[in-house]
Design a protein with these regions (language model features):
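Short, surface-exposed acidic-centric catalytic microdomains
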Residues: 32-82
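Active-site neighborhood of HAD-like aspartate-dependent phosphohydrolases
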Residues: 1-54
């Protein structure tokens, strides 16, 4: 098994920033915007009556970060990955004003097994070396030299992940599948060669795969000579 360096975004990848953000703005300004109304990375387009300063104000308020909840299974999968011997690093583009509250009220509260030593603050995530990056923002994945896992969110549903060398993952079970596939690539190729007639049964019974699409994408990319 390959020991991997796994890079992980925070907002809307391991925790629900957008849900809390929309709720906060609705309550503060008497609005009724829904999470499903967010179709773009620029959240301001969903709040046309507010200024950008009003929209982004909650992010620099310490109390706001106490309302953020973790995404299901994110903690369990990341802890499992570390127990498997993989290195897990949080890579967040957070503003410096939010770091202390965000770390204390979100990351270290819900992911206590992750150390501050394993946190990178970076806006240009492509400059950080790793084997996998999991992120909901396509622009953070584009151009990076790693397996690119795009976490599905409302703002990226229309983005063509596969055309841009990315694998779309819908939840943390998909992420776990991808980690297994990358770490055990050679073993899986060999096993599939021996089970050409029933590859799906082999993957389900021997490796526990349920959603095979992320795995198939990674395998195809590796067979073609890379992950870009």
């Amino acid at each position: 098994m390959r020991q991997l360096k796994i890079l992980v975004d925070m907002d809307d990848t391991i925790e629900y920033l957008l849900f809390a953000w929309v709720d906060c703005l609705n309550e503060r300004y008497g609005l009724s915007v829904k999470y499903s109304d967010i179709h773009e990375w620029n959240i301001c387009t969903a709040f046309p009556t507010l200024t950008a300063e009003q929209v982004y104000a909650p992010l620099v308020e310490d109390d706001f970060w106490t309302t953020i909840k973790p995404i299901p299974d994110a903690s369990e999968v990341l802890q499992w990955a570390m127990e498997q011997g993989h290195e897990v690093y949080i890579v967040t583009a957070s503003a410096y004003e939010t770091i202390k509250s965000k770390m204390e009220n979100v990351l270290f509260k819900y992911f206590p097994f992750i150390s501050w030593k394993n946190v990178f603050i970076a806006h240009h995530k492509q400059m950080i070396r790793g084997d996998i990056l999991i992120d909901d923002a396509p622009h953070n994945l584009e151009g990076g030299d790693y397996v690119k896992l795009l976490m599905t969110a409302n703002h990226n549903r229309s983005y063509d992940a596969s055309a841009n060398g990315m694998i779309r993952v819908n939840d943390w079970h998909d992420v776990r599948n991808c980690i297994v596939a990358v770490a055990h690539e050679d073993e899986l190729k060999e096993g599939l060669a021996e089970h050409k007639e029933n590859p799906v049964d082999y993957l389900k019974n021997e490796w526990g795969f349920v959603n095979l699409l992320p795995f198939q994408a990674i395998l195809l990319q590796s067979m073609l000579g890379g992950t870009n």
